[in-house]
Amino acid sequence: MNATIRPKPAGSRWTDEQWKAIAAGGRDILVAAAAGSGKTAVLVERIIQKVTAEEGAVDIDRLLVVTFTNAAAAEMKARIGEALERELAKRPHSLHLRRQLSLLPRAAISTLHSFCLDVIRKYYYLLDLDPSFRIADETEIELLKEDVLEELLEEEYGKPDNERFFAVVDAYTGDRSDAELQEMIVALYEFSRSHPEPDEWLAGLTSMYDVDERTDIKTLPAARYIAQHAAMELAAARRLIRRALELAEEPGGPRPYAERLREDRDMITDLETRLSGPWAELHRALKALSFGRLPACRGKDYDERLIDEAKSLRDQAKKKVEALRDNVFSLDPSVWLRHMREMKPIVETIANLVRRFAVMFQAAKREKGIVDFSDLEHYCLHILRRRDPETGEWQPSPAALEYQAQFDEVLVDEYQDTNLVQEAILQLVKKGSERTGNLFMVGDVKQSIYRFRLAEPMLFLDKYKRFTADGEEGGMKIDLASNFRSRREVLDGTNFLFAQLMGETVGEMVYDEAAQLKYGADYPEGEDAAPEVMIINRQRAAEEDEEEAAEWEAAELEARLMAKKIKEIVSAPFYVYDRSSGQPRRAMYRDIVILVRSMTNAPQMIEQLQAQGIPAAADLSSGYFQATEISIMLSLLKVIDNPHQDIPLAAVLRSPLFRFDENELAMIRLADPKGTFYEALCSFRQKPAETKEEANAQRKAAAFLERLEGWRTMARRRSLADLIWQLYRDTQFYDFVGALPGGRQRQANLRALYDRARQYESTSFRGLFRFLRFIERLQERGDDLGAARPLGEQEDVVRIMTIHSSKGLEFPIVFLAGLARPFHTRDLHHPYLLDKELGFAARFVHPRLRISYPTLPLLAIQTKKRLELLAEEMRILYVALTRAKEKLYLLASVNDAAKEIEKWKSAASERGWLLPDDVRASARSYLDWIGRALIRHRDGGALAGTKAPEEVASHPSVWRVAIVPAADLRGAEAAREEMDGGVLLALEQGRPVPVEGGWQKEVKRRLLWRYSYEKETAVRAKQSVSELKEQRALFGEQADEWRPRQGTAPVFSRPRFMQEKTLTPAEKGTALHVVMRHLDLQAPLDESWIRSQIVRLVEKELLSAEQAEAVDPAAIAAFFTADLGRRLCAAREVHREVPFSLGLKAAELYGGEGTESGRRVLVQGVIDCVFADECGYVMIDYKTDEVVHRFAGQKEEAARFLLGRYGTQMRLYRRAIEQIWRAPVAECYLYSFDGGFVVAVE
C-alpha cells in the first residue's frame, strides 16, 4: 500500500514538511519534530483536517489521541474546539461540524493512563477486580508496600532450612536491619513493572548466570558492553600516543621519544586486534603489558614545553590501558565465570522474593479495592491481548479488535517518552503492520529526558532508523527541522555545540543535517543576540572547600553575576520582539528565566537577586513541614498518639498553645528526673506547691493534662479530620497564626494538614498512628503537602526553574546556570544495578571472607548505564538551550579556570566535527562539553590557544566568552573583611591593635562633635502621648525627676531562669486598665463581685493568672464608693478606652528652638474614661503609680507629683476631646488607685 499525501493548498502557511506531517496517511508515521518546530500545531491541524474534510471526514470520537499530561490533553481539546468553531462560522449549516462539537467532550483525547482506566472500567469483568475500585494515593501505596514487605520477610525468617535466603540477608543487609534488602526488593519490583511481562522478566534474571567452565565469555550479553568500553579506551590511548608522536617529530620536539612511542602505538594496536579474538588471549596480553621508560632528552635542541606535553599525553594513554588491565581484565575469564555461577542462586533467591512480593502486593491491593498507575497499564494490557495456544505468542484480544475497529487513527504526542508497556498497548489498538498501519507518532528524541521514569527513547530511535522518508519499505519518517521559536544566533550556537557532542555511542543518535535546527522565524535585525558564556574563576584549590560549601558559593557568585546582567538587560535596555504587536519592546523581568539542573541552591539565588532589587520567584515545594505552625501541630498529634515522647511533648508545652516557660519546664523535670517527661508532668501536678510560681505552673499542667485526656478520647472515637479541626478550635491556634506575619499562608498550611487528614481517611488506612507514619513517609520521600503558589504569566518577576520543568516552554531570555556542577553518577556505584536488557547484577560477596567485589554483569551494566546517563544529560542540555527565543547566557563557576582550559585544549586539534567518543564520555559536567566545543571556535577568545580544524573554527555561529574573576563579584563587604582580617583577629584575641597617630585628632574631633539641631531628632511625624511625656522629661521638663543617675557602675540583670517572676509596674497598670474597661457598671460593684469578674476575665483569656493576682479588687471597689465613681455609674453616657489622633505644630509640642515652626506632628493616645452627666463631659485617667509609700502618706505631695508628671498629658487629652467632639470638657481628673484619691487637672 502506497503512502497517500493530499496536495498542499495554495497559499498555505505550512511548510512542505509540516504539510506532509498533516496530510500523509496509509501507514505508520513517525514525525521527528525538533524544538520549536510547531509539532503541537501540526498534530492539532492533522486532527482538524480529518474531522472537517468536505469529503471523507471522520468523527472526532473515531480518533484516539494520547498525550503526555492531562494539561496537554485539555489544551488540545480547547484548540480543536476553537478550530471547529471557526470552521462552523464558515459553514454554519454543517450538521457534521455541529456533531463534532457535541462529540468533542467525550472524545478519546487523554493521557494513556486515562485511556487504560476507560478500558478497565468497560471490561472489568475480564479481570479479578471489584468494579468499584479506586486509584490509590501514592503514599498509601508506599505504606501498603511496607506492610506486605514486613509480612513477606517475617515468613522467610520463620522458614526452617532457608539457607539461601539467609545468604542473601548476610550479603546485602547491614548488621542492624534489613532495610537494604527491602529497598532492593521494591526497586526490582518497580523496575519489572516497566516490562510488558514482569513475571517472565523476573523469572529470566538467572539466564545471564547460566554458565559453566566451557562457556565462551565473549558470547555473553554483558561482554558486548565490556568490549565496547575497551575499544573506546584503546582507541583513545592510541590517539593520545599518535599526538605525542606528532609532537616528538616537530622541530624542537623530543625526537628520542619517537621510537618508544611507536612501540606503544603498535602494542595498543595489537590489543585492539585481540579484542575480536578469545577473551583469554586479551587477558594474557594485558597482563604481560609493559610500557618502557622514555629516553632522556637534554640540551638546547629540545623544547621543554613539547617534552612535557608529550610526556603528559603518553601518561594519559598509559593510565587508560592500565585501567583496563587492572579492572575489567584483571581476572582470568574462568574466575569471572565462577563468580557468575556462584551468583546464580543468589539472583534466583532475590528474583523469587520479588515475585512473591508481587503476588502478595497485588492481593493486598485487590482486597482493599485499589489500583496504582502501574496496574492501570498492566490490567489494560491483560484485557487487550491473549496468548496464542499454539505458538505461545501474544495476539490482540477481542477487546483489542473492537478498539481497532473503533479508531481510524491512533495519534501519540511526545512519543519519545513512551515505555515498553505503553508501546505494547499502542501496538494492540492500532491496525495493521507498519506499512499498512494507522499509528501517527510525534516527538523529538533529542528531548527525551524522562529515562529516570523508565521512559525508553530507544523505541523512537529504533523506528527512526527503520522508517524511510517515502515509507516504501515500511513506516514513514518526517523530519520537522524548522525552528519558529528562536533567533538565528541561538540556533547556530546550539547546532555548533551538538554537532560536536551528540553521536551514536555517546548521545545515542547522530546530530546530522536532518537533526540540525533550521531558522524559520522572522525576527527583525538589531539586538546583539549572540550567546554569552561566562566562567567565574574562583582562583582557589578545590581541596580548600568542602563540596557542599563550594557549590553554595558557586550558586551565590553566579546569582550575583546574573543580577548584574539582568540589571543591564532591563535598564540598558535590551529589546525583545513582541509577536502580538509585531513590534520590539523593552525587556521586562518576566521575560527572563534562570534554568538549573536542580532547585537545591534556588533559595540562595533568590536571596541574592532580591538583595539587588530584582524580583525573583521559584516553585519551591519544600519547607512545608518546617513551618512553625505545622511543626507544632504535628508535635501535638504525636503527643495525643503517645504522650511518652519527650521532644514532641516539650515542644507542645513550650509553644504558644500552652506557653510554659523554661523555668516551668525545669520545675516539671525536677519532679521526676529519671522518668519520661510525661511522667514528670503527672508527678509535678500532684506534688504540693512550695512557691506561688509552682502553684501557677501546676494549674497550667493540670489544665493541659485535662485537655490532653479529652483529645486522646476523641482520637479513639472520632475521625482524624474532626480531631484536627477540634484542636484548632480548642486552642484557637488557627486564629492565632492568622494574626502573625504571613498569617494567610500559615492558615493555608493548617488547612492543608486538615485536608490531607481527610484524604488519608478516604484511603484504606485509619487512625492517628498510621497517619503520623504516613506523614513521616512523606517527609522521608521529600514530598510536600503545601502546594507552591503558581506564578501568573504576567507577574513581572525573574523565574527560576529546573530544566525538566521548562520543557515545552519558551522564554525571550534564558540564563543557564550551574554548568560546572558534576553529573549525578552516585547511582552507578550502587551495590546492585538494573537494566532492561541485562537484568539484575550485584557485587559478589565471598561468604567466608566477607569481601565484596564487582561481577562481570555489574561492570557491564555500569558501563552501559554511564553511557545512557551521558546521553540523557546531553538531551537535558539540548532542552535547556532550545528554550531561549532571543538571548542565551551560559554560566559556570570553577576553582581554577586556567587548569580547566588546559584540560579542554586537547580537544582543539581533533579532526572532524564530532569529538571522539572518549573525549565526550570523559565529561564530568556540562561545562566540560561546552568548553571542549567552544575552544575550537574562532570566538573562543579567552579559551583559544590551539589551532582547530578550519571547518569547525569558521562556523557561522557567534559567541561571547568571558572569564570573570570571583573577586569582582564577592563585593566591597567581602573585600573589607579580607583587608581588615588581621585587625579583627587581634581584637578577638585581646591583643593591642596599632593605631596611626595622624588620625587620633580627627577621631577625637568626631567623637566630641554635637549636632546643632539635636532637639529636632526627637521630632517624629507621629507620636504617642506617653512618648511625648517622656521626651519632655528628657529635654528639661521634670528633668530632675527623670534624669538618669550618673557615675554608677552598670548592673546586669540576672539570667531569666534565675529571676523570680513578678510583673513590672507597667504590666500591673495594664491589668487594672483591662478590668476597668470590662466591668459592668450596672452591677453591684462591691469587692466580692469585682473579684468574680476578674476570674471571668481570666477564663476568657483577657487576663493571665499573674495579672489577675496583681489587681486589687478592694482598691477598685473603693473607687466606685467614692463620689467620682458613683457619678460614673450614674452617668447618662460613658465612653471607655477612647482613642484619638490630633495634629499639632512641632514648635508647640517641643518648644520653638531647634524645630521647624511649620512642621506638624500627629499625636495619638487613648483616654481611659469620658462620661457625661448634668455637669457636662468629665474625663478620668487612672493611675497606678506607687505614691503612698514614696511620699509617706502626704497626699498633697503625691498630687503635685502626679500633676507634674501627667498634667501635659491630661491637657492634650482635654484638647483632643474638645476639638474632635466639638464640646467642652467640664472636669478633668486623675484618679490614683494607690491611696484612692482624686487629683483635679485645671
UniProtKB/Swiss-Prot annotation:
Binding site for ATP: A33, A34, A35, G36, S37, G38, K39, T40
Keyword DNA damage belongs to the record: yes
UvrD-like helicase C-terminal domain segment(s): 514-808
Domain of life, per lineage: Bacteria
GO molecular function, one term: ATP hydrolysis activity
EC number(s) stated in the UniProt entry for this protein: 3.1.-.-, 5.6.2.4
A cellular component term, taken from the record's GO annotations: cytosol
Record CDD domains: DEXQc_UvrD
Record's catalysed reaction(s): Couples ATP hydrolysis with the unwinding of duplex DNA by translocating in the 3'-5' direction; ATP + H2O = ADP + phosphate + H(+)
Family statement drawn from the similarity comment of this UniProt entry: Belongs to the helicase family. AddA subfamily.
Subunit: Heterodimer of AddA and AddB/RexB.
HAMAP family from the UniProt entry: AddA
Biological role stated in the UniProt entry: The heterodimer acts as both an ATP-dependent DNA helicase and an ATP-dependent, dual-direction single-stranded exonuclease. Recognizes the chi site generating a DNA molecule suitable for the initiation of homologous recombination. The AddA nuclease domain is required for chi fragment generation; this subunit has the helicase and 3' -> 5' nuclease activities.
UniProt-recorded name of the protein: ATP-dependent helicase/nuclease subunit A
Protein source organism: Geobacillus kaustophilus (strain HTA426)
Gene responsible for this protein: addA
